[in-house]
Structures are given as structure tokens and as C-alpha cells.
From Swiss-Prot:
Keyword Ligase among UniProt keywords: yes
InterPro entries: Acetyl_CoA_COase_a_su, ClpP/crotonase-like_dom_sf, COA_CT_C
Reaction catalysis annotation: N(6)-carboxybiotinyl-L-lysyl-[protein] + acetyl-CoA = N(6)-biotinyl-L-lysyl-[protein] + malonyl-CoA
Organism: Burkholderia thailandensis (strain ATCC 700388 / DSM 13276 / CCUG 48851 / CIP 106301 / E264)
Cellular-component GO terms for this entry: acetyl-CoA carboxylase complex
Subunit structure: Acetyl-CoA carboxylase is a heterohexamer composed of biotin carboxyl carrier protein (AccB), biotin carboxylase (AccC) and two subunits each of ACCase subunit alpha (AccA) and ACCase subunit beta (AccD).
Alphabetical keyword list: ATP-binding, Cytoplasm, Fatty acid biosynthesis, Fatty acid metabolism, Ligase, Lipid biosynthesis, Lipid metabolism, Nucleotide-binding, Transferase
Domain of life: Bacteria
Protein known as: Acetyl-coenzyme A carboxylase carboxyl transferase subunit alpha 1
Amino acid sequence: MKTTFLDFEQPIAELEAKIEELRFVQDDSVVDISEEIERLSKKSQQLTKDLYAHLTPWQVSQIARHPQRPYTLDYVSELFTDFHELHGDRAFADDLSIVGGLARFNGHACMVIGHQKGRDTKERAARNFGMPRPEGYRKAERLMRVAEKFGLPIFTFIDTPGAYPGVGAEERGQSEAIGHNLYVMAELKTPIIATVIGEGGSGGALAIAVADTVMMLQFSTYSVISPEGCASILWKSAAKAPEAAEALGLTAHRLKALGLIDKIVNEPLGGAHRDPKGTAALLRRALGDSLRQFQGMSVDALRERRFERLMAYGKYKETTARA
């Protein structure tokens, strides 16, 4: 698949277009231009390194939303075997914006749950663009209870702009469904490992992200509101989204520095969409390391550790001001 370049990547896009043109010409040319292709390829790689080393929070937000970025089901196919999807909340409907089911990770049985946005227009509409309704969160809770019953570790993958704010969703108890999941996940008697793989949008993300370990891919985001939403409220204009992204502190490195997440999983050069398999390999290692940390831990110790982790959020330190 041809890479889609973002607006701020246009210098890279122009170089890649030249390289592609030269490769096309080389097929029918008697002149060897392989050295020129190699020179431009190295230049493109260095330009990508330089650009990605100084990304703004707004640019990171754009990468997190990239249309070719791997979604939950892409990681399921790369990281897990014997995946068997489970459907429905047993109360109202099956919300396709959240997927989940039984699987094996490195040979160990587990439960996998995550947001799913969809690739084309038809699938995006069917999956509500990755914005869950209450039945999606209740399905997730049902699968978590199954995992708890059989002592299976839970892996969750977060990638949503937020919970769906429609009238029907509110009528069916959207806030209650989210709040109930927070309560349930805090008390579950089995390990939970959450990874933000794209957008981590507010309560819609948090409802499957209360965990023993929370990780973020390098170019994912996690925030109480989208930059556009924040800009519309504070400045009455979505055009201020870059400033809002800076103020929100939504990048993985900022959140790690604040102690709100536990680990950052690096992405290949140019982001996960450039090398999905390479990203999956890095994520597999991180998930395996996290899971080993909890193997053999008693239920009481696991829950106590989770409680202490949650209670550590929002701590502050008093200092004596100098005159």
C-alpha cells in the first residue's frame, strides 16, 4: 500500500516521489541510476529522522490518527493466535466499535479487548468510527468477567476519539457504563495490561484502560479532550488546535514524565503505519515483559499493587517558598 503522507511530511513525500519516479525509469533505462536512488533514499531517511525528532504535540496527534496506522485487529493478527471473537453485551446489542475475544499470547490463554475504527467508509460507519456506545463498554465488561472467572490475563488496546455522545447512547446510560467499567477494572482479580495504540480520547479510552500496566506507543496520544474540542471551548476556534495540543500535554513522553503511564513502546522510523510488522514485534516484547511481571503474583498482591498505583495519581509535594 502506498504511504499517505501528512501535511508536515511534504518534504519527505516529494523525495519519495522522486525516488519512485527514478525506480520506474530504471526499469526501462540502459543507464545505471541505482547510486542516485540510493543517495536520495538516504537523504529521505535522514530527513525523516530529523523531522520525527522534533515533532510538536499537534503533529503527534496527526500521526496517532493516521488512516494507515495499525488498529486493534491488525495487532491481534500479528501478536495473538487462536483468536475467537465474542459478541454482544447480553442486554441490548453488539457494538462493533469494541472488539474482543479469547486468544493465545506466546502460547498462554488470554482475553483481548480493544477499540476498532474501520478502514473504509462502510466499515467506519459500522464501527461508529471507533466511538463506543454503552453496549460496547458493557460487552467489554462481560469479557473481563469471563477472563476473571478463568484466571486469564487481559490485554486491552485503546484507540478512540472518545465515547459516542449521541442521544441514544446517553439514554442507555453512557456515563454509567463508563463509570461501572472503571469500578470493575479496579477490582478485577486478574492482570490487566493496557496499551494506547492511537488516540486515547477521554473517558471513552479510560473505560478499558484501568490496568496494572499502561503503555503507549511512541506516537499515540492520551487526553481528556481532543485538541480541536479544547480549542473550540477555550478559544472558540478549532484553528487553535496546535496550541491546545501543546497545553493538553497529550504525548507519551509528557505523560510518562508525569507518572501517568508506565512505559513507552518505540515505533519504527516514520511511525507505526510505515512498518506495522516492526511495530508489532516491538509491542510483543513489551507485552511479554509486562505479563511476566505479574505471573506468580497472588490476587491480593495484584489488587493491592493496582490500588496503590491508582491512588498515586494526583499526588503533590509542598515546598517552602523563599522570601
